[in-house]
Each structure stands twice: as C-alpha cells, then as structure tokens.
Regions:
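Class I SAM-dependent methyltransferase SAM/SAH-binding core
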Residues: 77, 83-133
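A short SAM/SAH-binding and catalytic strip from SAM-dependent methyltransferases
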Residues: 142-156
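C-terminal helical/coil "lid" or tail adjacent to the Rossmann-like core of SAM-dependent
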Residues: 40-42, 48, 229-290
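A short acidic, Gly/Pro-enriched loop at the edge of an enzyme's catalytic core
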Residues: 132-143
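A short glycine-rich, Lys/Arg-flanked "PGG" loop and its adjoining helix->strand segment in the class I
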Residues: 157-172
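Conserved catalytic/acceptor-binding region of the Class I
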Residues: 174-242, 251
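Conserved alpha-helix/loop element of class I SAM-dependent methyltransferases that forms part
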Residues: 55-74, 89
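Class I SAM-dependent methyltransferase Rossmann-like catalytic core
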Residues: 38-58
Length: 307
C-alpha cells in the first residue's frame, strides 16, 4: 500500500490521502498520537469560490446581520474574514466602531481590502495571522465576530477559548455557522442528498465539521462565556421569492456543493453521473414548483467579569 508524506505525517493510500493530495492546501500538526488539520478549506481558494462567498453574503445580510451592531468607539476583532464578504456589512452597520479583520490567506486579505476601499469605508484594518497563533494580548478587544469559520477547524473548542481570552470583561463573542444536515427540499431527491453528504464527508476528512451549527450552544458555554443565546436563522425559498431562489439556491448552496465535485469523485465518495444528477436536482428546487430550506445558527455569549 503506497503512502505519501504530508508535512511530518505519513498518510496511507486511502480516499483521505487522495482528497488531501487533490486539495493541496492541507497542513498537519502532530498532537500526541493523533493529528489535527489546519489551513484546510474544503471549498478551495479560487475566483469562483470568492464569487460564491460574495453572493452568499449579499443574500443573507438581513437574515444574519440585522441584529449585529457595535457601539461607537468599540474595537472589534473579525476572525477569518476571508475575502471580506461579511466585513463590508459589519463596517457599514457599525460605522463608528473600529474593526481589525484577520485571515491566514494573503490573497484573500488583498481582495477584502480592495472591497473595503471600493465601498469607501475607513473603519477597517487588516492583518494576516493564523487563528491558533493570533498576535494580540489578552483582553484586547471589546467584541469578537466569527462567521463561517468554525466549520473548517479541527479544534473549534480551542479556537473559541482563544477568542474568549482576547475579549475584555463584558465583551461579546458572536459566532455564525451553517448546518448542512438541516437541508430539506422538494422535489425530494436521493441523488441530491448524496451530493450534499459528499460535501459533509469531505469536510470531515480534512478535519472540519459541516454540521457544527447545531453545536454552537455547548461550544460557547464550554468556552466559558455567559448568557449564551443561540437562534436559528432559517432560509426558506419557494416561488414567491425568485430573487432568493437565484441568490441562495443557485449561486450559494448548489454552487458550494458543485464546487467539491472533483474532490468527491477523486476521494471515491461518488461517481460523476451520480454527483451530477444530485446537483441538477438541487438546481431543480429553484423552479416554480420547488421548495428549499436551510438553517443557520447565530450564537452570542458574554465574557464574565472576574469574581
């Protein structure tokens, strides 16, 4: 059985190894007798994915961010800002707050900064950093905001503990995540369900968790936060919302699933005909007699003051 080396870890010739080879963006860290995965983004870093993220942000502004606003003068850390898809909304809705947005990808940060400049915003600074090695002193920020990041981490609980330490007492940590297991649609399709499961499995293979939305409450409590509140944010689409059918079903969710086609086939999770049938059936739910439903989860916790 042929093996390959990824960093310091030898990976056997399995679908996991093939998926790792294909993505070429996975790095490993030894942690005792096991390993964790860092810097693994199952959707990839390419222009179409950046466009999908922008479409997603635009479609979900009201649903996810209507109740997100920070007081004048507050300093907010946005972790994992990516291409700035959420950053612009945050900065617009809290024009007198100061944002420091960080990401590990220099290319993503460059695009995010360009988006901020194009929007004429001046209350955002950017910094390149690893989530698990953030170069900031404890209690440096009034608030921390994290959106669609935990699902890609092999150690989400550790990350939340880091974010909590960076908060000042009485500061808030806001986390937004999806949950692919919440997806339901009509017409029903086993092929579409299997295509979605390919994405869930691939994300698990590289250390992430596409079902993490349902876990936000216990994760935030375990991080030591108080007064934790989690609210489901459901996207429901039928023929009465053709704008959302295009923006969310087609350009956001189905585009996300379709984007892992090559990885899923290479990893042995499906074949091209089955996967393509599933994607077609997902697009089919955007037609006049189709229905689509998906749930995001938004959690907010407060850092307690010292006893």
């Amino acid at each position: 059985m042929a093996n390959m080396m990824v960093g310091r870890l030898e990976v056997q010739d399995t679908p996991l190894r093939d998926a790792i080879w294909f993505r070429r963006c996975v790095s490993f860290e030894l942690a005792g007798d096991r390993y964790t995965v860092s810097k693994a983004y199952v959707h990839g870093y390419h222009p179409r994915e950046n466009e999908r993220l922008r479409d997603q942000a635009g479609a979900l502004v009201e649903l996810l961010h209507a109740d997100t606003a920070y007081p004048p003068g507050s300093v907010v850390l946005e972790v994992g800002c990516g291409v700035g898809a959420q950053t612009v909304t945050l900065a617009v809705q809290s024009p007198e707050a100061h944002f420091l947005s960080v990401d590990i990808s220099a290319d993503s940060l460059a695009e995010a900064e360009q988006r901020i400049r194009a929007a004429g915003l001046t209350n955002v600074r950017f910094h390149q950093a690893d989530i698990f090695a953030l170069p900031f002193a404890e209690e440096s920020f009034d608030h921390v905001f994290v959106c669609f990041v935990l699902e890609h981490l092999s150690r989400p609980a550790e990350a939340l503990e880091i974010f909590t330490r960076l908060l000042k007492p009485a500061g808030t940590l806001t986390v937004i995540e999806g949950d692919h297991g919440s997806t339901s649609f009509f017409p029903e399709s086993d092929a579409a369900s299997r295509a979605i499961q390919c994405l869930v499995t691939l994300q698990r293979m590289v250390g992430g968790n596409a079902l993490i939305g349902r876990q936000l409450y216990p994760l935030l409590v375990e991080a030591g936060l108080e007064a934790v509140k989690v609210s489901p944010r459901m996207v429901y689409v039928d023929a009465s919302r053709p704008d959302l059918a295009n923006a969310f079903i087609k350009k956001t969710f189905t585009a996300m699933v379709a984007g892992v086609r090559a990885s899923a086939i290479l990893a042995g999770l499906t074949d091209s005909d089955t996967f393509d049938a599933g994607v077609r059936d997902l697009y089919r739910t955007a037609e006049s007699d189709g229905v689509f439903c998906y749930t995001f989860f938004k959690g907010v916790g407060i850092k307690g003051r010292p006893a």
